[in-house]
Amino acid sequence: TESEDATKFAEMAKENGAQGSGPYQGESYDAAALMILAMQKAGSADRGSIAGNVMDIANAPGEQIGPGELAKALELVAAGTDIDYQGATGVEFTDVGEAKGSYKQLTIEDGAWKTVQVR
């Protein structure tokens, strides 16, 4: 996406020595964060417990959590506060657990990538 959170993630990644805009970097970051937060909520690293809590972590209602706010999110979850993890990619799941998503339509102009639109 081209959201504020995606830009924040890219800047944060660059500050820490990563490219920040490579394929699936934001998605990988978000997947790891969701697992960590679901473990915190479940109080367990058991895969069934994680799976049972991911959608609660990722979807509203709750305090929105962006990239770089994992420590804050862990504290909120530990305190029993609902969160709505947005992360780097605007994480959201459907009722059956499928990722809602968007994608960029890109073109190359003058040797550089240009976004045509986000769908």
What are these regions (language model features)?
Residues 1-119:
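Extracytosolic ligand-binding ectodomains
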